Amino acid sequence: MLAHVQSYLWMLICMQKMEVKSLNSPDETRSFEKGKLELVRVGGAVVGRGVFQPGWRWSTSVKPLAKTKSCEAPHFQYHVSGVLHIVMDDGTEKDCKAGDISLLPTGHDAWVVGNEPAVVVDFQGMIDYAKQSK
C-alpha cells in the first residue's frame, strides 16, 4: 500500500506545475465533537490536518457521522503533536506520538491520550473523513 501511495504522489508531482497552499488557510473545515479537520487541495491531492482535543475518540466523536463500525478511512499521516492511541479491528494497538509516521488501513478506532491535543497531517485518507453519511 505504501508503494501505491508513493507512486500516486510522484505522479501528481511530475504532472503538475508548482503550487503552494497553507493548512493555515484551508479550502474546507469540518468540525465534529472535540475536533476538526482542515483540508487543502493541491494539484490532484487532498491533504488534511486533524486536530483532536483531549477526550476525543473516533467511536464517540466521528462514528455518529460515519455510521460505520470503525473508521473506514485509510491513513498515511505524520503526527505533529500529542498522543493518539490506535486500535485496529484485529486487536493490534499502538500509541503514536509527535514525530511518528503511521500507515493505517481501514478498520480502526483511535483516541487522544493525555491532556494535550493530538495533531496529525494526513496525506491519504481525509477526503471523506468526518462527512455526514447518507
Which stretches of residues belong to each language-model region?
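A short, N-terminal "cap"/entry segment at the start of jelly-roll beta-barrel domains
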Residues: V5-V51, S59
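Glyoxalase I/VOC metalloenzyme domain signal
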Residues: N24, P54-W56, G125-K134
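Conserved short histidine dyad/triad with adjacent acidic residue
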Residues: R49-S70
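Short beta-strand segments in beta-sandwich/barrel cores
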Residues: R57-W58, G82-V87, A110
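Short, conserved beta-strand element in jelly-roll/cupin
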Residues: T68-I86
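Short acidic-glycine-tyrosine-enriched beta hairpin
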Residues: M88-G107
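Ligand-binding loop in jelly-roll beta-barrel domains
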Residues: P105-A130
